[in-house]
Amino acid sequence: MINEATGQMQGLLAAIASKKRQVNLFEQNILPALQKNYQVLQLGYEQNTGELFELLDAWQTLNMTQLEYWQQVQDLLTLQTEMDKTLQQN
């Protein structure tokens, strides 16, 4: 029983660490780069040097990636909840 709980905890801790790295990548690299790209294309469109479809594509990519980010955050919170439940059971 103790070995099973220990194994569960180790698995959850590894999954949480991995998910935290993924969330951090979104926060530090991916989302800022997509936001900057969208802003640059928006400025270009406002100055009549960019295409509307490029701007819309950047907007869609940014929004879809933000949704993926929030999914990763939800997954992280779910893992943390599972860990709390495992700790309470033992």
Question: Residue spans of the language-model regions?
Answer:
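Amphipathic alpha-helical coiled-coil segments
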Residues: 1-68, 78-86
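Metallo-beta-lactamase
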Residues: 72
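Small/polar (Gly/Ser/Thr/Ala-rich) solvent-exposed segments
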Residues: 89
